[in-house]
């Protein structure tokens, strides 16, 4: 925009401001009630037909009603829409001389006309004369507030549009030439398609999820050499949905596809579609696919698609809100009346359970790829990728780190090595050692390290509590192995006991669940066995919540109780408006609920008694372990097992099935 156009735009703003100022000045002039009302009063005084000039004396309305009852009123003339009346009264009691009096008629005097007719009074009505000046002033007065609101809103939109357009040429209306152009821009996607995307990520940077990587390598091959697949009648998948917990590499996979395919690529978040203005989301979806059609083959990546793809009609009454309109448009664009050839939509979410069924069907998202946390071999491969630019000590084994980080995803493993590097730099070490790795693992799992426990009594209580957990984990065959026991406070915990969980958490036996319940109750059992029931602390509150949840799942989900092999809970649990709607919390009778409560109590009591028995039978081992723990504040699982092995038989396990009643 040249200098002349810029000056013209500024003149437009000045004229708008001047118009608003004139309206405000006029409003202030009318509010003063000086010039106008003086002029109006002078006009009325000079007008012989005005009510003020018809009668000089006033009379109260109550007195008027009294005169009507006595028959003294002969004629009455109404002025100003019946608000003022001029009456002519005559009577012998009034000196037989007619009097003309002015009366102000109150609002709501509906019975006056009837009384006048009964008294045979001559009634005359005079229509109000049009006061042009007053009409204009009333009209302007009624337009002042709406005009100011419109003007302020107009200027607000211009300022917002100028900020969004990042205008550098000095024009107040931006390069679009005005607010109308910018308002139309609300339905446009601001991000441009990357013709040759350079994300810096390729499939060489992806590790630990080889099966998933193979799926996407096939899509990349299809985009590069479609004839290889079309020769046998195959068509490219229209959509791929990545599902998995946070931090497992879903977004990283999309970056790798963009870096490998070398085709136009555009990425957008699901939350960018929905705005406060109705219809903007659907317009942005249309604009997105219009851009993609201009550069086919093309890849569209929608991150966190659950922000716009939630189940329609959720909640009470459903509703056709902005999110549903956006979803409907997305469904149409992906597989509607018009076909989109050469456009591959890749989406990622960690809440696939709340997505709309129409979005998940073949033809839209042909493939649903689950990205789970990596296994041990996958973690080793991921650690090798992230350790490329880290100076690790030769004594460090990635296999050992992978063994200690069961359940970690790619993002957590990357953060782990980064935390270890930060700790090494803080201690001014040239390389990352085993100590830094251990501290980083503890920091990622439990949080920042807190000050040591100074009070000897509390330290001893915490030591017995944590040793109780570790004792059960060491002695029970079905329990996870002890990894570490520490008295160093981290986060809100005064002490911690780590276990090495099973590599496949999806397959857990009944004995493993029961052993975990006994292990969780081991801390409280140690407190009772050593200090007595009066010295039981509140430190086991989190353990009790975990125990109750495990016992409840044994009964409701897995059929591992005396109630029998039944499942009393549906997948997804009880939800309220979270993408699906309403579901009652309990889907069984009250009588069965009582039995469930009894079973929960039975399981927890039997497991707690077992934990107390373990502490009583292995008191010497427990005391020795606590002595070493208080002295060193940290014991590894191997060190703890050596202490226990001198005075306890490893492992000890009982048949729990016989303890649970069938009825």
Curated annotation (Swiss-Prot):
Binding site for ATP: 244-251
Listed transmembrane segments: 13-33, 136-156
Top-level EC class as recorded in UniProt: hydrolase
Keywords of this entry: ATP-binding, Chloroplast, Hydrolase, Membrane, Metal-binding, Metalloprotease, Nucleotide-binding, Plastid, Protease, Thylakoid, Transmembrane, Transmembrane helix, Zinc
Cofactor note: Binds 1 zinc ion per subunit.
SUPFAM superfamilies recorded: FtsH protease domain-like, P-loop containing nucleoside triphosphate hydrolases
EC number from the UniProt entry: 3.4.24.-
Lumenal membrane side: 34-135
GO biological process per UniProt: protein catabolic process; proteolysis
Stromal compartment segments: 1-12, 157-663
NCBIfam families, per database record: FtsH_fam
Description of how the protein assembles with itself and partners: Homohexamer.
The family this protein is said to belong to: In the central section; belongs to the AAA ATPase family.
Record function comment: Acts as a processive, ATP-dependent zinc metallopeptidase.
Name under which the protein is recorded: ATP-dependent zinc metalloprotease FtsH
Species the sequence originates in: Heterosigma akashiwo (strain NIES-293 / 8280G21-1)
Lineage of the organism: Eukaryota, Sar, Stramenopiles, Ochrophyta, Raphidophyceae
